[in-house]
Design a protein with these regions (language model features):
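N-terminal pro-sequences and low-complexity stem/linker regions of secreted or lumenal proteins
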Residues: 2-678
Length: 678
C-alpha cells in the first residue's frame, strides 16, 4: 500500500516554514527577513514505523541496490527552489554569514548601497553565471552588484509543490554544491569525469577533444552495465533543433575523445547495440526529428521512449546498473525554460520507474543541478587554500561553487530526511566507486583531486541500507501548483559520525589570540573547509583553512596591531560558527574579573562549557541559546575559580552565546552540530 502523499493545501504567503525551525516548531528570521509559518493544514506524512525489519527480498546492505539513475538538470540554486522548505538550511538560517555592519548574507547591497532581500517570483528569468570573482568569493556580498536584483528571487511553495513533495517523502541534501563556480559545461564534466581540467567556460558541443577518461568508460572497463538516455534528434552537432527535442548539448560524453564516432564502420564494436561504448553513450545523431515537437505528454513519451522501454519486463535492452538521463532544453529547467516543465519531466521519470516494482524497489534516483545560474544561495561553499593541487585556474579557486538542489529517491532515502554532509558533483562518482567495490568490480576515478575527495562525501551518509522502505509513492501533479502540507517536525536529519570544533586561546604577554580548529571522527582523510572572517578592526575577507583529524589548523590574530582588540568569526558547513571578540587584559585595569572559557563537544552527548575567572573580582557569565535548546542561564565564577556547565543539543545541533558582566567587549559564540553516531 502506498504512503499518503503530502497533501496540497492553499498557498500561505510568501515563505512558508523554513530551515531547522522544525526543531523548535517555530519560524525564525535570518537577518531582517521574516517568513510565515507552516503552510496549510492538510495531511502530512506519518513517521516511519520503528523497529521495522528488513523486507522480504532485501538483505539490508548495499547489495540490495541494483540500479542508479542520475538526472542532472540545469541552473538553479538551492535557496531558489528549497529556501522555504521546513528542515532545510534556507532563509531562516540563524547560523548564516554576517557582515561587519551587522547585516546578514540575506541582505545584499546593490551598487547604491540599498539592501535587497529574497523575494518570491515565479518567473523564468536568467542571471549571469560566470567564474568565482563575480560575486566576491572571499566576501559573498556582491550577488546583486554582479547579477542584478532578480538573482535574489525564489520560487513560491505552490510553484515548487511537486519538488517539495518529493523532498518531504524522500531525502534532500542541503549541503550539496556544484563542482565549480562556473557555467554548465565544466560542471557537467565533473559529473561524468571528476574534473573539468581547469576549464571555466562553456564550449561547443560534440567536439570530442577532451582526452581524459570518463566514468562511463571506467564502468565499461569494470564490467558494470551503463547507458545514457537522451533524445538524439538532429543532423550534425547542433545540440538541439528546438526546445522540446534533442539533448541541448548536455550529453557531456560527446566532448570526450573516447566517444568520437568519426571514421568508425557500422560494425565497429563501439557502435554495437546493447554493449558498444558509443551506443551506450548515445553519442551519434540520427537524421530527422522526434515527433511531436512540443511540450505535450506525447512529446515526453517520445523523448523518454528508450528509457521507458528499458524499464519494461522483458526489455530488449533492460535498464543497466548505471543510467544517466539528459533532457531537451524545454524540459531541462534552464531559464528561460521554466521549472514546471522540469517537474513534469521528473514526474514522468519517476512514474516510469514505478511502473516496474522490481526496478523501483531496487533503484536510487539522483536528481541534481549542474550550476546555480547566478541565482543567490546564502551558504558559503568550501574553498581550497591557494596552491591546492587540481583546484585552481591561475589565481582563481575552481570550487566548490554555490549550493544546488539534490534529491535522492529510493527505498533507502524514504521518510523525509535532510542530509547535511558536504557533497558535490563528484560525490556521485565516489558513490559509484563505493558501490562497485561492494559488487566486486572496483574502479577509482583518477581525475578527482585529493582535496575534493577529502571535502566531499560519497553520499552514503544520506542512505540507510539497513532499513529499506520499498513500495509505491504518490506525487502531486506539478501543473496543480499547490503547496504541500509539511509539519514543522516532519523532516529529520541524517546522522553524521564527525564534528568540527574551534576553540580560542589568549597569550596575554605576546598579545596574540589563536583559534585552534579540529575535526573529530569521520572516515580516514575526512576534511572540512573552515573560513575565517574578521568582524572588526581588519578588512573583511576570508581566510580558508582545510582541517582533518590529523591536521588541525590555527588562525592567529595579533592584537598589538589593533589596540589589544580582536573580533572574528569562523564558518564551516552545516551551521558551524565560532565568533570570538574581546580585548586582552593588559590594555585594561587588572582589578576585575577576567573571563576565559573552554568548550568541549561530546559525541552523542552534548556540549560541556567550563567557565574560568582569571581576574581579581567575581565574573557573572550569561549563557544564551541563539538557536535550539538551552534557554538563558547565569553563572557566577569567583576569582581564580571555574565552573562547568552542561549544554543540551537538538538532534546534535547547538548555538550558544557567552557574555560576561566584567568585560562588555568579551563575547564568544559556539554553533554547530556534534556527531550523533560513533
Amino acid at each position: 500500500m502506498a504512503d499518503d502523499p503530502i497533501a496540497p493545501t492553499p498557498e500561505s504567503g510568501p515563505g512558508g516554514a523554513t530551515r531547522r525551525r522544525f526543531l523548535q516548531g517555530a519560524g525564525a528570521a535570518a537577518g531582517a527577513l521574516m517568513f510565515g509559518g507552516i503552510g496549510g493544514a492538510g495531511r502530512a506524512f506519518a513517521e516511519p514505523a520503528s523497529g521495522r525489519g528488513v523486507p522480504t527480498g532485501f538483505r539490508g546492505d548495499m547489495s540490495d541496490l541494483k540500479h542508479v539513475v542520475i538526472l542532472m538538470q540545469e541552473n538553479r540554486s538551492l535557496d531558489h527552489y528549497f529556501g522555504t522548505l521546513p528542515g532545510v538550511r534556507g532563509f531562516s538560517d540563524k547560523q548564516a554569514l554576517r557582515f561587519p555592519d551587522g547585516t546578514s548574507v540575506f541582505q545584499q547591497k546593490d551598487a547604491s548601497g540599498a539592501i535587497v532581500t529574497p523575494q518570491v517570483d515565479d518567473g523564468t528569468w536568467g542571471n549571469d553565471h560566470g567564474a568565482w570573482g563575480d560575486v566576491g568569493h572571499r566576501t559573498w556580498d556582491q550577488w546583486v552588484q554582479h547579477n542584478g536584483t532578480s538573482c535574489m528571487n525564489y520560487h513560491s511553495d505552490a510553484y515548487m509543490g511537486f519538488y517539495h513533495s518529493v523532498a518531504a517523502q524522500y531525502t534532500i541534501a542541503d549541503q550539496y554544491f556544484c563542482a565549480e563556480f562556473g557555467p554548465t559545461d565544466p560542471n557537467r564534466k565533473y559529473l561524468w569525469s571528476g574534473t573539468a581540467n581547469t576549464e571555466t567556460g562553456n564550449s561547443d558541443e560534440s567536439n570530442y577533444d577532451r582526452p581524459w577518461i570518463t566514468v562511463a568508460e571506467q564502468l565499461q572497463n569494470a564490467g558494470i552495465g551503463w547507458r545514457l538516455y537522451s533524445d538524439n534528434s538532429g543532423n550534425g552537432r547542433d545540440g538541439y533543433v528546438s526546445s522540446w527535442i534533442g539533448d541541448y548539448g548536455d550529453n557531456e560524453l560527446k566532448y570526450f575523445t573516447g566517444f568520437d564516432p568519426a571514421g568508425l564502420s557500422a560494425g565497429d564494436p563501439k557502435l554495437r547495440p546493447g554493449t558498444g561504448l558509443i551506443w551506450r553513450g548515445n553519442c551519434t545523431y540520427y537524421a530527422g526529428t522526434t515527433a511531436p515537437d512540443d511540450d505535450s505528454d506525447a512529446n515526453l513519451d517520445a523523448v523518454l521512449r528508450d528509457f521507458h522501454d528499458a524499464c519494461q519486463p522483458g526489455a530488449q535492452y533492460p535498464l543497466p546498473q548505471v543510467s544517466w538521463l539528459v533532457a531537451p532544453y524545454g524540459w531541462s529547467e534552464h531559464p528561460s525554460a521554466d521549472s514546471l516543465h522540469g517537474e513534469r519531466y521528473v514526474k514522468k521519470v519517476l512514474d516510469i520507474l514505478q511502473s516496474n516494482p522490481d526496478i523501483w524497489n531496487h533503484t536510487l534516483f539522483i536528481l541534481n543541478y549542474d550550476e546555480n545560474d547566478g541565482k543567490f544561495d546564502h551558504v558559503l561553499p568550501p574553498w581550497p587554500e591557494a596552491g591546492t593541487a587540481g583546484e585552481y585556474a591561475g589565481s582563481y579557486p575552481l570550487g566548490l561553487g554555490p549550493r544546488v538542489p539534490m534529491l535522492l529517491v529510493s527505498p533507502w532515502t524514504r521518510g523525509g530526511y535532510v542530509a547535511s554532509e558536504v557533497f558535490d558533483h563528484t560525490s556521485t562518482i565516489t558513490f559509484l566507486e563505493t558501490w562497485a567495490a561492494h559488487l566486486g568490480k572496483p574502479f577509482t576515478c583518477p581525475n578527482i583531486s585529493a582535496w575534493r575527495r577529502s571535502i566531499s562525501g560519497n553520499l552514503t551518509s544520506a542512505l540507510d541500507f539497513g532499513h529499506p522502505r520499498p513500495g509505491p509513492a504518490s506525487f502531486p501533479d506539478p501543473l496543480a501548483e499547490q503547496p504541500v502540507s509539511i509539519t514543522a517536525d516532519h523532516m529529520k536529519v541524517r546522522p553524521l559520525a564527525f564534528h568540527p570544533h574551534a576553540t580560542l586561546s589568549e597569550d596575554r604577554r605576546s598579545g596574540k589570540v589563536t583559534a585552534s580548529m579540529t575535526l573529530a571522527g569521520g572516515s580516514t582523510g575526512k576534511a572540512l573547509s573552515f573560513q575565517v572572517f574578521p568582524d572588526d578592526y581588519q578588512p573583511f575577507t576570508s581566510t580558508p583553512l582545510t582541517v582533518t583529524a590529523r591536521t588541525p589548523r590555527e588562525y592567529t590574530w595579533d592584537t598589538t596591531a589593533t589596540d589589544g582588540k580582536y573580533a572574528f568569526s569562523i564558518y564551516a558547513n552545516d551551521g558551524f560558527v565560532r565568533s570570538f571578540a574581546g580585548q586582552l587584559p593588559q590594555a585594561k585595569p587588572a582589578d576585575r574579573g577576567i573571563p576565559r572559557a573552554e568548550v568541549e563537544l561530546l559525541a552523542c552527548e552534548g556540549v560541556r562549557v567550563t567557565l574560568h575567572n582569571d581576574g581579581t573580582r567575581p565574573a557573572r557569565y550569561t549563557l544564551t541559546a541563539n538557536d535550539y535548546l538551552g534557554g538563558t542561564r547565569q553563572v557566577v565564577v569567583e576569582r581564580g575559580q571555574s565552573r562547568t556547565v552542561g549544554w543540551p543539543t537538538q538532534q546534535g545541533y547547538y548555538d550558544l552565546v557567552l557574555t560576561v558582566d566584567a568585560d562588555a567587549s568579551w563575547t564568544q559564540r559556539y554553533a554547530g552540530r556534534i556527531a550523533t553516531v560513533r
